[in-house]
Amino acid sequence: MDLENLAEETRIVLADLIKRSDIKKGQIFVLGLSSSEVAGGVIGKNSNLDIGEVIVKTILTYLNDRGIYLAVQGCEHLNRALVVERELADKRNLEIVNVLPNLHAGGSGQLAAFKYMKDPVEVEEIVADAGLDIGDTAIGMHVKRVQVPLRPLLRELEGAHLTALASRPKLIGGSRASYQPDPIRKF
């Protein structure tokens, strides 16, 4: 696998999603990552640290440059807990849990987050503003309502299916109400 190409494709997909989701500085972007799926295997069966590191480092660098926080979701063995910067956990009063991910409990993305983040911690849950799911890891539980599906520029990253979510405020008030425009509303 060409890791430089993987990094470039990750950057292309991410740049487009950040633009279309309208996520802003100080908000949270969640990443679900199956390096097994990227490598062409079955989720949870062929974790690959090199793939996890390339993808997480690429995304973390891009988001840090824009002041957006990254939350990296773990697998179901950790109840889909997330690695975030301690600064974010403190700022949002998130409950920190005590676990260290490994390749088969948490996965390569979480290991990479622990390597590349300044002061990483695990939290059980978060309410993110947008996210990218690489390999059908089910990030929806961590994205706030109302979730809006976004089609990534690429349908796959190597062997992994890609899906993405943004979020928008709920529309309330019914037929008499007026609404402010937003860039992701579908009507």
UniProtKB/Swiss-Prot annotation:
Domain of life of the source: Bacteria
InterPro entries attached to this UniProt entry: Antibiotic_NAT-like, DUF436
SUPFAM superfamilies on file: TTHA0583/YokD-like
Endpoints of the signal sequence: none
Similarity comment text for this entry: Belongs to the UPF0340 family.
Protein name: UPF0340 protein SMU_87
Originating organism: Streptococcus mutans serotype c (strain ATCC 700610 / UA159)
